[in-house]
Amino acid sequence: MEYKILDCTLRDGGYYTNWNFNSKLVRQLIKSLDNNNVDIIELGYKSPVIGGPYRKCNDGFISSVINFKVKADLAFMIDVKDYITNNKVNKSLIKDIIKPSSVFKICRVAAKYNEIQ
């Protein structure tokens, strides 16, 4: 069995900082995680909800902050409740934010059972 280590310090920490982080701190954290062989670094959300830049995880912004090669896969999270239209998950909205050319390789999805039935 293969194990992967995922770090969600920034995504989870955003609840305390409204997803605003100092770019130098982010670069130092990512370099440290990468040097310690963390497999996946979850940077924040891709969300239409108001919040700092790590609540949006815009590819251009992330690329400007992380201007160096990272071995780990970069990830973001979406919350299904942000993509519900007429009481149904709007899959086209989700597909629009997941681009093959993205700096992100992984999208994690947070959902409650009743949101995805």
Regions found by a protein language model. Give the residues of each.
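N-terminal small/glycine-rich loop or linker at the start of catalytic domains
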Residues: 1-18, 71-73, 101-102
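N-terminal glycine-rich anion-binding loops that anchor highly charged ligand groups
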Residues: 2-8, 30-45
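Conserved, mostly hydrophobic/aromatic
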Residues: 13, 33, 107
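Basic, gly/Ser/Thr/Pro-rich low-complexity segments located predominantly at protein N termini
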Residues: 18-19, 49
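Anaerobic metallocofactor- and corrinoid-dependent redox/one-carbon enzyme cores
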Residues: 23-27
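Short amphipathic alpha-helices and their capping/turn segments at secondary-structure boundaries
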Residues: 28-34, 63-66
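Active-site beta->alpha loop and helix N-cap motifs at the rims of alpha/beta catalytic domains
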Residues: 40, 45-117
